[in-house]
UniProtKB/Swiss-Prot annotation:
Subcellular location: Endosome, Multivesicular body membrane; Prevacuolar compartment membrane; Vacuole membrane; Vesicle
Record PANTHER family: VACUOLAR FUSION PROTEIN CCZ1 HOMOLOG-RELATED
UniProt-listed Pfam families: Intu_longin_1
Keywords: Autophagy, Endosome, Membrane, Protein transport, Transport, Vacuole
Disulfide bonds: none
Name this polypeptide is given: Vacuolar fusion protein CCZ1
Gene Ontology terms: cellular component: Mon1-Ccz1 complex; multivesicular body membrane; vacuolar membrane
Length: 679
């Protein structure tokens, strides 16, 4: 974790460099140094960057490491008046540098946030392709262009994604875990183990099954603590953290998990003008703001070419199409195009007809997002995802990964490359049945709010007066109820709206002679299964003339667990997050060296901030004592404290007791979650 000044936002990213220094000593020729450069990508083409300038930056970075007192550092920062270069060293010989523009007039983003993204970018590359050292230079350069450019361009064009999970980027080696009731029903786990993992046909084929709760940004907000990994079944999966963070990243950037997003067939593009397609090489072209895929461009009006054109439009990202209805309404003409778009989605499977008592509940949606059931004409990335993962100390090697969902629960099935059963339609249908039985039980027993949700959610006690972030250092798990942070102004938020209009218009121009109503009747009831889908609830997004019934109340009665931070405005939440970050940075040395330390502070907004670091956990608790009337007198008298030696038990700490009986009671129960995960 690095300390330095903060930087202006808006569009803070300038360029990214990847290079591998040679073994030559002393002064080197430019031709030699140029061989070391693997990637240089500038986000703004305002001026041509010469090769000499690129090589000069490499020299500065190398000199910093050479002159450093600690050559084992994995991150260093160079600050100038114009920019700041954040560099990480990976695999002992590769350097990755991100340049950040400096603008004191713009809202500041702390350096550790960018450092966290740098590490994530590298780790996501390794689980997708493998380690840098496993490739020849020309192959590595091609893969770096494919991954790094797309990764950073999406963050550059949607900069609010940089800070959405603000404090979590300080713990980039940790992955978010969903906080479910430790006393909840475990039958769903037994179903997966007994019906899938221990079965003879699966035992040597399925390596692991991962279950995540990923509530849609459009769903009823249930609290951040419910977000993350619920369970996996293989203790030897070494890349579990990187894989989990990759899923959280794409969900943060694109808003939803869909077939297109998982197949990485969608990226932001910044243009102005008519919507244009990409060429067959996947080189982005044109002058508009759109989301595009890598299918071939066609200009002909023949039937076969129209089919190709249709496939191009079909694989445009469905991820963003649904927000448009609420954003622009009927006046933009987007409803017809979204209706047309919905007609080309496959029919989803529903549970059996709900009873009279369940009519107000949304029917469950479930099915495959990535599987060999996808339409034959779709690219292979829609049929399976090949990822290079590590298990049980073995070398990183490729695995086939399938994705299945049930409402907001995502299930990931990791299979050996030699497991041919996944190409059988009968096997996939049987797998679908077992997963449905298991995850339905998980929903009914652990995620649904069984009491009357509307009345229950209005109780004052449902809004906790504290929020927490706890890391498990031994298992790299992170538990947090800190809400997402919106860092930027409304100008960036309009990016979604512009993109949605263009995507829908592209679909509307496909076959304008056929009305949306005609297609909704003929295609929704058809038996064609394209194999494309999207997580979350989309029933309410169907047109009113759709034959699929739509309930007025489409919200899922999920269990809520909110805290006072969820109710704060963005500015106050941002200020509290920055003060928390600064307090954590002062502990950076002790966090790395496991020196025990404990602090109790008061933020400028009057919030109590408790931080405790020991060899097992980093614990951060924010307490809103102002609304805690039973505890006001004691809290008002407290002063900032720092202790370097204290009782082994956090519950015996006098500083911890200042947080009040509600926090003490919560932690005594919360210990069971930590203990269950460590068992």
């Amino acid at each position: 974790m690095s300390q330095s000044q903060s930087h202006g936002s808006g569009s803070p990213l300038k360029y990214v460099i990847v290079f591998r220094p040679g073994e030559n000593k002393g002064e080197q020729e430019d031709s030699v140094v140029s061989e070391q450069l693997l990637l240089h990508h500038a986000f703004e083409d305002t001026e041509l960057i010469t090769l000499s300038a690129k090589l000069g930056k490499i020299g500065i970075i190398q000199a910093l490491w050479t002159l450093s007192e600690d050559t084992n550092d994995t991150c260093k920062i160079i600050e100038t008046e114009q920019e700041t270069m954040i560099t990480i060293k990976v695999e002992g010989e590769f350097y990755i540098t991100l340049a950040i523009g400096v603008d004191p007039d713009l809202l500041a983003i702390p350096n550790p946030i960018f450092e966290g993204h740098l590490w994530n970018c590298y780790h996501f590359f390794t689980i997708k392709y493998g380690d840098f050292t496993s490739f020849e230079k020309h192959v590595l350069t091609d893969l770096l262009n494919e991954h790094f450019v797309s990764f950073w361009n999406d963050l550059y064009r949607k900069p609010e994604s940089l800070t959405r999970n603000f404090l979590q980027y300080l713990c980039h080696d940790f992955y978010k875990v969903a906080d479910l009731d430790p006393n909840g029903d475990k039958q769903w786990e037994a179903t997966i183990i007994q019906d899938l993992l221990v079965q003879t046909e699966n035992y040597l084929g399925i390596k692991d099954i991962l279950v995540y709760n990923i509530p849609s940004t459009e769903s009823t907000y249930v609290g951040k603590c419910k977000y993350g990994l619920i369970r996996n079944f293989c203790n030897e999966f070494e890349d579990l953290g990187h894989f989990s963070n990759w899923l959280q990243h794409i969900h943060t950037v694109f808003g939803k998990i869909s077939s297109h997003v998982l197949a990485e067939n969608v990226h932001y593009e910044l243009h102005s003008g008519q919507l244009e397609q990409t060429n067959s090489d996947g080189i982005r072209d044109g002058n508009d703001l759109n989301l595009s895929d890598n299918n071939n461009e066609t200009d002909s009006n023949t039937f076969s070419q129209l089919s190709t054109n249709f496939m191009h439009n079909l694989t445009l990202p469905i991820t963003f199409a649904y927000d448009a209805i609420q954003e622009v309404g009927n006046t933009t003409g987007i409803n017809n195009s979204v209706s047309l778009f919905m007609n080309y989605l496959p029919k989803w499977q529903n549970n059996s007809t709900a009873s009279e008592n369940e009519k107000n509940k949304t029917k469950a949606r479930y099915g495959y997002l990535i599987s060999p059931l996808a339409f034959d004409s779709l690219p292979k990335s829609y049929k399976l995802k090949k990822m290079h993962l590590k298990f049980n100390g073995e070398e990183r090697k490729p695995y086939h990964v399938l994705f299945w969902y049930y409402n907001d629960v995502l299930v990931v099935i990791i299979c050996n490359e030699s497991f041919d059963s996944i190409w059988s339609k009968e096997y996939l249908n049987e797998l679908n049945k077992h997963l449905e039985n298991s995850i339905k039980t998980l929903y009914d027993q652990n995620l649904y709010d069984l009491p009357n949700t509307d009345n229950h959610s209005n109780k004052k006690n449902d809004i906790l007066n504290f929020a927490y972030l706890i890391t498990d250092k031994k298992r790299n798990k992170l538990y947090s109820s800190f809400p997402d942070l919106s860092w930027f102004n409304e100008q960036q938020e309009t990016l979604y709206r512009t993109t949605l209009e263009l995507v829908s218009n592209g679909l509307e121009q496909l076959r304008p002679q056929i009305t949306a109503n005609e297609l909704s009747i003929t295609t929704i009831d058809s038996n064609k299964q394209w194999g494309l889908d999207i997580m979350g609830n989309i029933l309410s997004m169907l047109p009113s003339n759709s034959p699929v019934p739509v309930t007025k109340d489409a919200s899922i009665p999920l269990m809520k667990k909110l805290n006072f931070l969820d109710k704060l405005n963005e500015k106050v939440l941002r200020d509290i997050s920055i003060e928390t970050l600064r307090a954590i940075e002062t502990l950076s040395q002790s966090i790395n060296s496991n020196i025990q330390e404990e602090k109790l502070l008061k933020t400028s907004d009057g919030i109590l901030l408790y931080i405790r670091n020991d060899c097992n956990n980093l614990t951060i608790i924010l307490k809103n004592w102002i609304q805690d009337t039973k505890h006001q007198t004691r809290a008002l008298k407290y002063k900032n404290h720092t202790l370097n030696s204290y009782s082994t038990s956090i519950e015996d700490s006098n500083l911890f007791k200042n947080l009040g009986p509600d926090v003490i009671s919560w932690y005594s129960e919360y210990k069971q979650i930590l203990q269950d995960d460590s068992s």
